[in-house]
Swiss-Prot record:
The modification Phosphoserine is found at S984. One of its GO terms (molecular function) is semaphorin receptor activity. The gene is Plxnc1. Residues 35-452 form the Sema domain. The keyword Translocase does not apply. Disulfide bonds join C64-C87, C156-C194, C283-C329, C455-C472, C461-C506, C464-C481, C475-C487. This is Plexin-C1. InterPro entries: Ig-like_fold, IPT_dom, Plexin, Plexin-C1_Sema, Plexin_cytoplasmic_RasGAP_dom, Plexin_RBD, Plexin_repeat, PSI. Glycans are attached at N86, N143, N149, N252, N386, N407, N694, N773, N802. Belongs to the plexin family. Receptor for SEMA7A, for vaccinia virus semaphorin A39R and for herpesvirus Sema protein. Binding of semaphorins triggers cellular responses leading to the rearrangement of the cytoskeleton and to secretion of IL6 and IL8.
Amino acid sequence: MEVSRRKTPPRPPYPAAPLPLIAYLLALAAPARGADEPVWRSEQAIGAIAASRADGVFVASGSCLDQLDYSLKNRLSRLYRDQAGNCTEPVSLAPPARPRPGSSFSKLLLPYREGATGLEGLLLTGWTFDRGACEVRPLGNLNRSSLRNGTEVVSCHPQGSTAGVVYRASGTDLWYLAVAATYVLPEPETANRCNPAASDRDTAIALKNTEGRSLATQELGRLKLRGSAGSLHFVDAFLWNGSVYFPYYPYNYTSGAATGWPSMARIAQSTEVLFQGQAALDCDHGHPEGRRLLLSSSLVEAVDIWAGVFSAATGEGQERRSPATTALCLFRMSEIQAHARSCSWDFQATEHNCKEGDRPERVQPIASSTLIHSDLTSVYGTVVMNRTVLFLGTGDGQLLKVVLGENLTSNCPEVIYEIKEETPVFYKLVPHPMKNIYIYLTAGKEVRRIPVANCSKRKSCSECLAAADPHCGWCLPLQRCTFQGDCTHAGSFENWLDISSGPKKCPKIQILRSLRERTTVTIVGSISARHSECVVKNADTGKLLCQGRSQLNWTCACNIPSRPSYNVLVVNATFSFPSWNLSERFNFTNCASLKECPACIRSGCAWCKRDKKCIHPFTPCEPSDYERNQELCQVAVEKSPKDSGGGRVKESKRNRTDGAVQVFYIKAIEPQKISTLGKSNVIVTGANFTQASNITMILRGTSTCERDVIRVSHVLNDTHMKFSLPSSRKEMKDVCIQFDGGTCSSAGALSYIALPHCSLIVPATTWISGGQNITIMGRNFDVIDNLIISHELKGNANVNINVSEYCAATFCRFLAPNLKSSKVRTNVAVKLRVQDTYLDCGTLQYLEDPRFTGYRVESEIDTELEVKIQKENDNFNISKDDIDITLFHGENKQFNCSFENITRNQDLTTILCKIKSIKNANTIASSSKKVRVKLGNLELYVEQESVPSTWYFLIALPILLAIVIVVAVVVTRYKSKELSRKQSQQLELLESELRKEIRDGFAELQMDKLDVVDSFGTVPFLDYKHFALRTFFPESGGFTHIFTEDMHNRDANDKNESLTALDALICNKSFLVTVIHTLEKQKNFSVKDRCLFASFLTIALQTKLVYLTSILEVLTRDLMEQCSNMQPKLMLRRTESVVEKLLTNWMSVCLSGFLRETVGEPFYLLVTTLNQKINKGPVDVITCKALYTLNEDWLLWQVPEFNTVALNVVFEKIPENESADVCRNISVNVLDCDTIGQAKEKVFQAFLSKNGSPYGLQLNEIGLELQVGTRQKELLDIDSSSVILEDGITKLNTIGHYEISNGSTIKVFKKIANFTSDVEYSDDHCHLILPDSEAFQVVQGKRHRGKHKFKVKEMYLTKLLSTKVAIHSVLEKLFRSIWSLPNSRAPFAIKYFFDFLDAQAENKKITDPDVVHIWKTNSLPLRFWVNILKNPQFVFDIKKTPHIDSCLSVIAQAFMDAFSLTEQQLGKEAPTNKLLYAKDIPTYKEEVKSYYKAIRDLPPLSSLEMEEFLTQESKKHENEFNEEVALTEIYKYIVKYFDEILNKLERERGLEEAQKQLLHVKVLFDEKKKCKWM
């Protein structure tokens, strides 16, 4: 909205805005500096905010936590507390418009341990989720895993309160969280209830140790509520003088009312909860009911003062608000501490419990500092230049600034920022931790960084320093009022004058008559003695009058001789200092007209005391009669008597004359809301107004500001009088009327509100005749004077029309005026007039009146008529209230037609209305009639549609049929011939394509050679820890971080007795085997549970592999017993038992070294070669199908023609890769059908191959730019030039799309914008596989039309064979590295387990050799090698694409076929995946049999050799995993089936001791469970 300050349009004339009003509007614009300040907008309402000294600003909104930089322009990281990865609020109950402090989903946001030597800063967060969960995370990045977490620390209710502070206890290195929370409160039935543990239901304040490990924390103490205390709402927590203070107030969450007085609880800053009492706070001054709500809190530690915002309203609206609803009260902490030693009435204290009804005296605030305001919401206090500064937020979006005087007296607040939307300010104001010139202002969903002062609005030095703002000072080099940091050369003390200097110290040039024949020009003010020069010139002629240089310890001064200078009227004086200049222009033309001594001397003229007149400074006067001192001159003027007439109205204290006492009565004041511009006609109603001679209105707003006294404008009659109220800031004021100096009678409250703001005009289009209902949406419409439509006539003349309107606070309704005299199509401006100011509200478009083409009357039943009126299509939004339809029948009969709906068709719009409850409807429908339509001001009669005669129709029908038949025969014959011709062309094209593809496929098989890179650098092996976890938990990524906790940094004293006992119990073989068998017999012990249990057991026994191997032997024998009676060949084939998964894990542990040393390199070469072959041809980005593949299902047979394009790629030099040895100009081959993303990948791979090291940036951090001469164009997968196919499908851009030719130069550059992750395109995009649509054929042209349509998949099956040939040698090398024996020795694990299987077969008297072969195959190739072959990401630090996965599945199947004893009978119809390696399988089978035989023929391993090998492996993996976590997970299964296990132990002999140990372990765990942590 723009505020128009012109005088108004010429017709009709309006009075111009008065000068004071314009000055006020300029003053209002001063806080608008914040309009350009950075703002962060979140998806949900902000619930918490905190600033770190090194890691930015943290903002919690909904279920998200954002880490922002200090400028709020960039988000550094984001944490989603919602598992779905969004920021939605988790309950259906929306928070109120003004939530109480702490009433949100984010309860705590506490950075701590910042700046501690050698320690990383941490962030403690508390949420309502997970029963009031807390997390501790590193401050640097929210995406890192939480270090510690726990539940039931904060309130789990969105409306419940929580306040906390983290501190380091004296004498220790431990950090503690002191937290106060509302754990229990009644909630509506629709809310998600959360019930804390019984021990927490009466807890008010608790102390937690933040250093405890995950799931092993301990509560250090608590302070409980008294039984009669009710709910407490905690607002803040802070440290002072060795104690922790918690401001709070008793609150009934059901009724929404405070039940007691605000208080402050105090505990010791210690390692346990030591209650030190509580103190009640009194901030009731100026409010009859008292202020029982505490809205905000701030400790001003530098002066030991605590500031609080208190309120008497609930904050849920304006219905109970008054000018004295809220107040800022300041308390001395020493007094609070003294009163806190009294008895306690809200908490269960061991001493000093209050008796029932006994309430101690409340602490009184500092009276001079109390500030009463209608709507404060927040406070933050600090000390600047020994001045206490308080920032206050308001409910209408203002940020106020209060500077306390030396005796702590509050001044009138300055408005330093206003939020345009008037959103209530959040209860917490956060200062910038690094720059004290900014403060973070939170409101609704937004956070703004606001300067703490508007220094620049003060234009002169005296104005700057007189404002007494400690943040501002006068910058001499810039000659502006600035922050000290914004002043050039501010490091020099003399260049920046702060408020301690005072306005009298401002530098100023003075011209003084010193002697009869000489006038001195000098400079006064706070100027230290330094080198300076001064020059005085005649401004009219430029003649030099005098000049000088500074003498020692004196500033420059020069003397002007008087006699030659009588005729000089304008003088320019300039003083030059080393870093700044001061110039001033003196005009002596009007000296004689100045009647006051101070004004005379201030202008440079001379005051002659003898004659008491102002003279030209060079005019002679007796020397003793010159007055040179402006201050003495000012004192002399003040002592002289002055006329008291005019000026402000002074309140008369005289008494009324004797006689009858006249009673004056005030009833009301109208309106009760006016804009900040004031109002010239405010009416006060009452009685006996004409009996008073002196009537004034007194307005009292903020208590520390001056009140306004306004004399009555006009007494209309005995009951009505009119006042003209001045402009003011936004606030609510008390109004009282004073008659003849008597008592001021209250007239109620008056609200100054912001100017109206328009957001929407509905509808925005109307017809030229007008009369349509128009609604304007916005806010503050209840203060407008009238609404104006301004439009332009022919000849560019403007006409303003006042329209009648009905306005409420949020909308205005009016009828569009008739503009028949205007152009047919015109836009008019809608304006609001407030006082003499015009506000633009938007435009309303006028179009030509609607055109009605006819109507039809139909009757389906005899008591109802339907009238359908046809209208040309237009852009009018016609509603039921806009239209009135009447049907006339006969001479005097008329019927009102009830509007039903409007239907818009392609050609016409139909308006349907109905006439109900009539007689003879059919007769009326068939007789003569007419219809009148009134649309706003438009009234017209609609003609009835003409209906063709049935007779003519019957004649024309046979002729039309004959024509149609002839045309159909001709068209059919033509179409038949055309179809035959097209089919012949398409068959020829198909034959040609088949011949070409067969020949190309044959040539490729014979000639193609893949240039495999022999030197692919270091193989990127994963370390053992991650290899093991990926094989142990292939589908559960959530265990990685808890098992990989750094075990070296754990405290040796932090051992858990319960886990130690469980570890000892598991090492009992009989007990462990019994537990496993018992668990497997439970029906709900699923296959997933068996696999997880086996993996947890492997980790727990990672350093006891000898023992683990013995367990494996026992369980394997037991499994053989089960299978031998049924089908022995099926043993170990599936993973359905603990031992089968245990065997997989055991093989992974024991063969990790063999995998890394022998198999790893050929395996990595296979993956690299396969990937290189796939990328040699086209790959569809959307489906991942490729031309070169091993899997028919992933074959890209809809392949277009493609060509290789050689690019000259130039890599930009970046800080991440600044080596001089790096080659930055590289030739890269891409395909013209590659997307830009695929081209990036090939460019990255080329850089790695060329330089042996990566570029240094991620793929999504770079962009490609085509350079043609001096022009550059960024290449993107999707941009404005992308082809849009049928149904809105977008075709991704390719190299060919940009018409990039061989030798083109491509620049690789680092993106500046926020990086996004790799794009996964949806179904609305396509690449190479295109939709079968006409739009595609039009785009591609005739050359590709038939080819695309007649593609046949079988034409490209040779590509499978081509891919197989390319990788065949590498594949065979891999297979033989697996089933070969290096140095004629098998790995220990394989030899040991194969011998174990042979021995068991002999013991079982199994003579079938196939059974043992199958056992070995199921235990090694199937259980281990196939898992590795299909998942290279288990072994290497690489990303497996879906296409690579499909190819590796084919290779893995061929690998297993080599171990199969069954002969494959393949026919021509067999799957291609089987046929591809059909000829190779027999050879592989023979090699496998030789491999098995060679292992069997090797000498057996001794038990000593095997134990030594297992012991060495155990030592290798010490401290790799957090074994205590694994033991905890195992215990969860044991305790779940505790009764079954205990019953089994009771039945087994020899396990009595194990039974006792198990019971002991359970007792230890139960005791540990009682100790809770955050």
